[in-house]
Every structure is written in C-alpha cells, then in structure tokens.
C-alpha cells in the first residue's frame, strides 16, 4: 500500500514527455503541411521554418497534400468555434502540432508558438534574439487566443522594410483594413475643396 502510494507520487513528479519533437540532435523528420496553400498559411509556414532553422540548423520542408504523422506540423486546419477574427489555436494533441486560425490568426499562432514555447523575441526591424539548440520539443499545448483589438497599427517604418516585424507585432496598415488611398490627408478625394 505505501509502495503503491510512493510509486504513484514518483510518477507524478517525473518530467512530462514531449508531445512533439520537431528537431532532435540537429536533425528533423518533421514536415510542415499546409492544409490549403493560401498566402497566410504559407507565411506562417515560412516564418516557422525560418526560425526553426535559425534555432537548430534543421530545415523543415513545407508541403501540401500529405497525411500528417507524429512529429509533423499542420498549418491551416479548421479553427475551433471559439476562435474569432485574427485569433488562433495551437494544439499538440496526438503528437502533431496544429496551428489554425481565422484571417491572419494562423500567422499570429506561428509567431506565438515561436515566442512562447521556443523563446524567440523580435525586438525591431531585423532585430531578434533566440537561444540556439539542437533539440526542439514542445509540451502539451491546447491554446486559443483572440486579439483584444480589431485593428492594430504603429507608425514604425520597420513595417515597410521587414515583413516579419509586421507579422510578429500583429500590425496592420490602413490600406489593409480601410479603403486604399483614402486615409488622413486624402479627404479631398471624398469631399473636394471646391464644394
């Protein structure tokens, strides 16, 4: 009886096994599978691939029309019901990393994964920090996140020169959310001075 209790307590104290091993000893068998080959899915895949390579030196191929196996990444699968516009979901259930979202949320999910679980910080235009490692393992993740604001903007010039900065900080430009060419100093187009 006391042996069983001791064994139970010991098993609870053991470290949890990784849910998904993306890179082991600098090598990967994982692939990134796009559910649909869209601009946001491909952007999410390319950002994830870039930083996995910068961290570990391992290159994860991006493919379409493949069946996922344990250790793979699926980008763009159907988002859970509680994901709103630009929100995302991360899951490592079944040993497969799934990044899903609505609108730009898929990219924001990839960025959050890099930031929250792989320790990548993006500070400014082409300025980031990370810890190199030959191993990248993810714990059990079941996360849904929705942005507090519909529109996020800054006047930082880095947005024009560094697309990763823009995605990382979840920023938008006026022409992406409003009528292109009709912003601030263009009111003359809407209401000409002659009127």
Q: What is the predicted role of each segment?
A:
Residues 6-10, 14-91, 124, 128, ...:
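Acidic, contiguous N-terminal accessory segments
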Residues 44-47, 51-53, 85-195:
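Feature activates predominantly on carbohydrate-active enzymes
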Residues 1-4:
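Bacterial N-terminal signal peptides that target proteins for export
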């Amino acid at each position: 009886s006391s042996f069983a209790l001791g064994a139970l307590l010991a098993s609870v104290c053991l470290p949890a096994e990784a849910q998904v091993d993306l890179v082991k000893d600098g090598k990967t068998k994982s692939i990134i599978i796009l559910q649909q080959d869209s601009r946001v899915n491909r952007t999410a895949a390319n950002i994830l691939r870039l930083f996995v390579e910068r961290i570990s030196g391992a290159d994860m191929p991006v493919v379409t029309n493949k069946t996922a196996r344990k250790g793979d990444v699926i980008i763009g699968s159907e988002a859970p019901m509680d994901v709103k516009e630009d929100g995302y979901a991360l899951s490592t259930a079944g040993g497969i990393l799934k990044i899903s979202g609505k609108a730009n949320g898929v990219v924001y999910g990839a960025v959050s994964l890099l930031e929250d679980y792989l320790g990548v910080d993006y500070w400014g235009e082409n300025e980031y920090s990370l810890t190199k490692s030959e191993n990248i393992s993810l714990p059990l993740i079941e996360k849904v996140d929705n942005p507090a604001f519909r529109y996020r903007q800054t006047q930082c010039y880095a947005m024009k020169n560094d697309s990763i900065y823009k995605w990382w900080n979840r920023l938008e430009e006026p022409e992406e959310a409003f009528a292109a060419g009709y912003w601030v100093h263009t009111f003359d187009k809407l209401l000409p001075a002659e009127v």
